[in-house]
Each structure stands twice: as C-alpha cells, then as structure tokens.
C-alpha cells in the first residue's frame, strides 16, 4: 500500500501528486491511463496517454475516490487522475460557517 506523504509523478504528462490519505485502491493510481511512479523512478518510454483520460488535473486541487483515498496535485498536467479506469472526483471545499 502507498503511504501518506508519498510523492508520485505521471509517466505521460507533467502531473505530480502527494498522497494525502492512502487506501489500498491507490495501488492502481493512474494518470492518463498509465500507472503513476515515484519521483525517482524513470518514466517508461512506451507509456502513451489514453485519449479518454486526457482531461487534465488542476494544481492545488484535491482528488478523491469512493474508498476515501485522497491526493493533492502539486504540478498540473494533461492526464486525468484515475484508479484503474475510473476517474477521481475533484474534492469540493466545505463552506465556512457564518461568523455573525
């Protein structure tokens, strides 16, 4: 299982993330359809972006899945973050309480 705080990069674009909340599902974390790798791992020369998963990722945004896994994008890129073939959802910010 990937640990909290692990930094990963895409093999097909510039996307980089930090794992905020890890679950077993993150073992299949992908970007652009290809598995994400640690920052010190070489990118595969055979990795190609899946056009169906080329929606991009926004810097500074958190992405989550149904299992509770959460990643923070530290460098934006063209690939869509997914677990397997299922795209992650953008985490919505909680509204602040009124300060009357």
PLM regions and their residue ranges:
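Short, charged, intrinsically disordered terminal tails
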Residues: 4, 93-100
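Acidic (E/D-rich), amphipathic helical modules within compact regulatory domains
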Residues: 2-42
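Short, solvent-exposed interaction modules
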Residues: 36-83, 87-91, 97
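A cross-kingdom feature marking solvent-exposed beta-strand/loop segments within repeated
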Residues: 1-2, 47
